């Protein structure tokens, strides 16, 4: 290999930024292939179970700024930052066009409840910062200031399963679903409270949804981050919308956390 290339790779490794090749694990239900040029804010969270094991994609995330990734609390709760990497700028798990940054801090919401799934939001702090100005496939997204209206179309992106326990895809997927009334969502999930910190989206007939592997990924409305993939009953089942962390509800919490490290 050319000595110049070797030197460049060595420098990138020391900086904590390097090309990545990832493995396939699934995709959005009812969606279609999309490009990182249209989903520049989407990242992969990769985790290893121990210092001697390899990294594997576990959740999605969303770029808020060069050092801040928004994701679901259940993706990072009781985990160590040193066991995570963030893959950005690549829509394919098997590609070599993305970059990786190491994680320096995990900030799950202090009131996250794994039983009720309330406050299922977290921030992931990366170091070094993502080189947003150097890549046309990476870009931060603005946070929604208000909860989206019922019926508005929202876009979900991720690498989760195509169906419950279904097939997988190397390519990032995207699908549109309408925002669902919280009262109707509560009727569907009568056994678990739909709190103010939750947002529901999906089709009454089912067929389109996030699924396993999409957790932590973004739900976007009008080019703003409105929700974070959290939980649901199966995947794309009729009358069971997906449930998301309501980002607008947590905007003050996000701002407060960012002041501690930005």
Swiss-Prot record:
Main localization of the protein described in the UniProt heading: secreted
Broad EC category: hydrolase
Subcellular location: Secreted, Extracellular space
Peptidase S1 domain segment(s): 28-259
Site (described: Required for specificity): 209
Disulfide bonds: 59-75, 185-200, 211-235
Family classification: Belongs to the peptidase S1 family.
Propeptide: 23-27
PANTHER family in alphabetical order: AT26814P-RELATED (PTHR24276:SF91), POLYSERASE-RELATED (PTHR24276)
Enzyme Commission no: 3.4.21.4
Keywords associated with the record: Disulfide bond, Hydrolase, Protease, Secreted, Serine protease, Signal, Zymogen
Pfam families: Trypsin (PF00089)
Record carries keyword Protease: yes
A GO cellular component annotation in the UniProt record: extracellular region
Catalytic reactions on record: Preferential cleavage: Arg-|-Xaa, Lys-|-Xaa
Annotated catalytic residues: 74 (charge relay system), 120 (charge relay system), 215 (charge relay system)
Signal peptide: 1-22
Protein name in UniProt: Trypsin eta
Any one of the GO BP annotations: proteolysis
Gene Ontology terms, MF aspect: serine hydrolase activity; serine-type endopeptidase activity
């Amino acid at each position: 290999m050319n000595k110049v290339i070797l030197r460049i790779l060595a420098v990138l490794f020391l900086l904590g930024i390097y090309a990545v090749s990832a493995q396939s694990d699934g995709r959005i239900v009812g969606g279609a292939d999309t490009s990182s040029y249209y989903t520049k804010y989407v990242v992969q969270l990769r985790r290893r179970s121990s210092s001697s094991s390899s990294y594997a994609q576990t959740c999605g995330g969303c770029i808020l700024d060069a050092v801040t990734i928004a994701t679901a609390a259940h993706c990072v709760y009781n985990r160590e930052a040193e066991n995570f990497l963030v893959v950005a700028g690549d829509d394919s798990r098997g590609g070599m066009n993305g970059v990786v940054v190491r994680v320096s801090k995990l900030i799950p919401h202090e009131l996250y409840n794994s039983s009720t799934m309330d406050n299922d939001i977290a921030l992931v702090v990366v170091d070094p910062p993502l080189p947003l100005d150097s890549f046309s496939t990476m870009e931060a997204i603005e946070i929604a200031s208000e909860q989206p209206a019922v019926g508005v179309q929202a876009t979900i992106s991720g690498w989760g399963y195509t169906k419950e326990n279904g097939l997988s895809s190397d390519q990032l997927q995207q699908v549109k679903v309408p925002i669902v009334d919280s009262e109707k969502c509560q009727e569907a999930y009568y056994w678990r409270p739909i709190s103010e910190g939750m947002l529901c989206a999906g089709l009454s007939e089912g067929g389109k949804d996030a699924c396993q592997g999409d957790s932590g990924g973004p739900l976007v409305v009008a080019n703003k981050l409105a929700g974070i993939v959290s939980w649901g009953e199966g995947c794309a089942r009729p009358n069971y919308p997906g449930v998301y962390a309501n980002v607008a509800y947590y905007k003050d919490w996000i701002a407060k956390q960012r002041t501690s490290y930005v």
